[in-house]
């Protein structure tokens, strides 16, 4: 298959399927209703019950039907106090759920900076390879234009040049899955300033500069050219 056709197929696939928010599976109403024990306590942010249950022998990393731990549930429901308590009691801050998401990526996709900081402070790693796309929280955040999340992950040592299984870096995703607006520009700018490689091309051989020019993203083009992009 010619490279241009391959590239077009990959782009169509990514635009349809590579949405981290869509790929993630938060608990639905029926699951919340069925939760007991630590999952239920995490969902309602009940740190007191969490501590009591764990001290009475509950498995702190017990899984639900989608392999979510109570900590995953706390992250999805933005229950910061529950997440803090779970990690303090030994919950695995880097556990992956059934869709291969950790709490760092869950918080990043939700643009939940407080939960992200809680996750990182509790031992979550910005270096984890997550999602069905073999990506990172940084790639997901750049794709979605979550600029403060991007800056937080960079400060936490996220890999700047990781390439996911679509052939894209965080820098590329900020362009090809972005809208060229203020927040996506801020993501790209933060990545460039942090030292991301501005010349890693996609699978078709198109560089970030080429991709930005194709889309008419003039601010991104200017940032890339100033950084020596080709």
Residue ranges and their predicted role:
Residues 40-45, 73-79, 106-112, 140-146, ...:
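Ankyrin repeat A-helix N-terminal signature
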Residues 46-54, 79-87, 112-121, 146-154, ...:
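Ankyrin repeat structural motif
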């Amino acid at each position: 298959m010619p490279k241009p056709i391959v590239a077009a197929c990959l782009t169509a696939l990514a635009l349809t399927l590579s949405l981290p928010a869509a790929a993630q599976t938060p608990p639905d109403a029926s699951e919340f209703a069925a939760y007991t024990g630590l999952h239920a306590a995490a969902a309602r942010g009940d740190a007191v019950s969490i501590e009591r249950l764990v001290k009475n022998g509950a498995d702190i990393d017990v899984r639900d039907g989608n392999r979510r731990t109570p900590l995953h549930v706390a992250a999805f429901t933005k229950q910061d106090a529950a997440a803090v308590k779970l990690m303090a009691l030994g919950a695995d801050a880097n556990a992956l759920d059934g869709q291969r998401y950790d709490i760092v990526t869950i918080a990043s996709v939700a643009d939940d900076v407080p939960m992200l900081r809680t996750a990182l402070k509790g031992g979550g790693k910005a270096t984890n390879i997550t999602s069905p796309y073999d990506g990172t929280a940084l790639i997901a955040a750049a794709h979605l234009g979550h600029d403060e999340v991007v800056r937080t992950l960079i400060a936490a040592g996220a890999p700047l040049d990781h390439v996911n299984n679509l052939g894209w870096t965080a820098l590329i995703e900020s362009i090809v899955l972005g809208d060229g607006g203020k927040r996506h520009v801020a993501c790209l700018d933060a990545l460039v300033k942090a030292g991301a490689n501005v010349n890693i091309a996609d699978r078709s051989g198109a560089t970030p500069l080429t991709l930005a020019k194709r889309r008419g993203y003039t601010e991104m083009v200017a940032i890339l050219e100033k950084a020596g992009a080709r």
